[in-house]
Amino acid sequence: MHTIKAYKTDLSQFNQFLLEYTGNDLVELSSVDRKTVQHFVGSLSEKGLSSKSTGRKLASVKSFFRYLLKHAHVESNPASTVKAPKQHASLPKFLQKEVLEQILSHSDKDDWQLRRDKTILELFYSTGIRLGELVAIDVGDIQIDQKTVKVFGKGGKERIVPFGGKAAEALGSYLKERNIYVHKNLDDNPLFISKQGLRIPRRTVQSRLKKLFDSLAAGSGFTPHLMRHTFATHLLDNGADIRSVKELLGHASLSSTQIYTHLEAEKMKKIFEQAHPHA
């Protein structure tokens, strides 16, 4: 979100550009046209400014001219149709299978909370569900024999997500222990519970798994979306089509899933560079 200080900085930079661009000591704002604003945007890119920062500065200029137009200081807004440079989405970070196996195979003897954490991790990896979806799961939403879980995504949209044998095994073992620690006076029946026997909070999942990752896979930097990206990437690596991955992730449109196709392109590029004689 823009602050007054940021607007002031952006407009000061635009003013400096106008002085240099026109070669005048004073520039009439009514003389600024669309081409001038385009050159301003181009000058920012030439200076190495990111697409995001360039877009923000252009937004400041557009707002400034909207204000001038509203108060009749100019006859038109020369920036209104100037487009900001496209922001290239960064490739999602994901875990290598070996790192994940290292964490999941770590000893959890005499520590039910660690076993719960590893079950959560296994379910994250096996389903690609969001953190909010995971903590909202009730025991009745899990069908271990069918290897499916009912989750409620964005906007309360319900979907059935399959999970694998390892997740089913981990869930079966966890449920036996859960019944020992669950709070007896709960109104609902949460799948994952805290140390107090209540529905586990989102922040507890994040902090517990971050601690686990920091101790066993330094540098991996756990986030719930890291597991979501890992789930999608490993599926695509093993031949899943992008539309199936979209449905499993609960994306409303294919555009949200398209970023993973860039990963596939990067992979193909590396294979080419390693294998082709003229690479």
Map each language-model feature to its residues.
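Conserved catalytic core of the tyrosine transesterase superfamily
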Residues: M1-A279
